[in-house]
Amino acid sequence: MSVEDSIISIDSLQDQGINAGDINKLKSAGICSITSVLSTTRRNLTKIKGLSEIKVEKIKEAAGKIKKYGFLPATIVAESRTKVFHITTGSKQFDEILGGGIQSMSITEVFGEFRCGKTQLCHTLCVAAQLPTDMGGGEGRVAYIDTEGTFRPDRIRSIAERYGVDADICLENISYARALNSEHQIELVEQLGNELAEGTFRLLIVDSIMACFRVDYSGRGELNERQQKLNQHLSNLTRVAEDYNIAVFLTNQVQSDPGASALFAAADGRKPVGGHVLAHASATRILLRKGRGEERVAKLQDSPNMPEKECVYVIGEGGIKDTD
């Protein structure tokens, strides 16, 4: 079954007696699949203009008839996991420690200091996600949310040349947005629903996840509000990954903390920003750091199915690759 086949369109609610006007209201809020309806709380659905509690209850009931969303035999869960795919990082050693590459249906986070390859990895994945599956790709499009203005089309062209693909087509398949602030960043993810429901996207990149939040919420007095907003944002990203079977890839910054625990910090005491909220949302967590000379080191710190391990990679004209 293809990814497109696994997404049940929200338009199927019409067969259950829900009128087209109410369906369009859901779409305008970025809710474009039956799974999205089921995973959105009644409270949040009633916040959509024009949807009363009675209407929301009918919509929930109709969605529940189309797709069962309670206890299921584990065999069905196992079957759904067969749809998971991996996108190559460009390095065989890097892919190996990840169990095949960047995984769909979950969030992968990389964090590290300046010039360790976070954005270069994003650019490599933009091309890799479009490659055929036999080349480690996802044969699909990419959504790219840039919070720091570091996206460079010229890098995409260089990486496309490495893989022998048309650079213009590659760029055409990348849906790019520059996030202006944390509110805009949240809205961009919410607006993606209509495009993702088409089933042609394989990867969503946010580079970087915390940059706008750190600017908009700067003092300790605003930390609680920041973490609440971040939690909601990450919940939406998790839902996107699971509902549309795409890989969500986040880059993150680091900060110094000499008293940080080994779980969250690197050997030099630096830890990723975002706290426990981000740590729990990321299924896979990777630390990137500088190695000897031009070498970079990737350490898998947290994964639901792979042990802690590290590898060495380099950044070349064609993106991330193995050392010679």
From Swiss-Prot:
UniProt keyword terms in alphabetical order: ATP-binding, Cell cycle, DNA-binding, Meiosis, Nucleotide-binding, Nucleus
GO BP of this protein: DNA recombinase assembly; DNA strand invasion; meiotic joint molecule formation; mitotic recombination; synaptonemal complex assembly
Annotated dsDNA binding sites: 214, 220, 226
Pfam families in the cross-refs: HHH_5, Rad51
One GO MF term attached to the UniProt entry: ATP hydrolysis activity
Compartment(s) where it occurs, according to its Swiss-Prot or TrEMBL record: Nucleus
CDD domains in the cross-refs: DMC1
Residues reported to bind ATP: 112-119
Binding site for ssDNA: 214, 217, 220, 226, 296
Stored InterPro entries: AAA+_ATPase, Dmc1, DNA_recomb/repair_Rad51_C, DNA_recomb/repair_RecA-like, DNA_repair_Rad51/TF_NusA_a-hlx, P-loop_NTPase, RecA_ATP-bd, RecA_monomer-monomer_interface
GO CC terms: condensed nuclear chromosome
NCBIfam families with a match to the protein in the record: PRK04301.1, recomb_DMC1
Family membership noted in the UniProt record: Belongs to the RecA family. DMC1 subfamily.
PANTHER family on file: MEIOTIC RECOMBINATION PROTEIN DMC1_LIM15 HOMOLOG, RECA/RAD51/RADA DNA STRAND-PAIRING FAMILY MEMBER
Its job: Required for meiotic recombination, synaptonemal complex formation and cell cycle progression.
Record's subunit section: Double stacked ring-shaped homooctamer.
Designated name of the protein: Meiotic recombination protein DLH1
Originating species: Candida albicans
Gene coding for it: DLH1
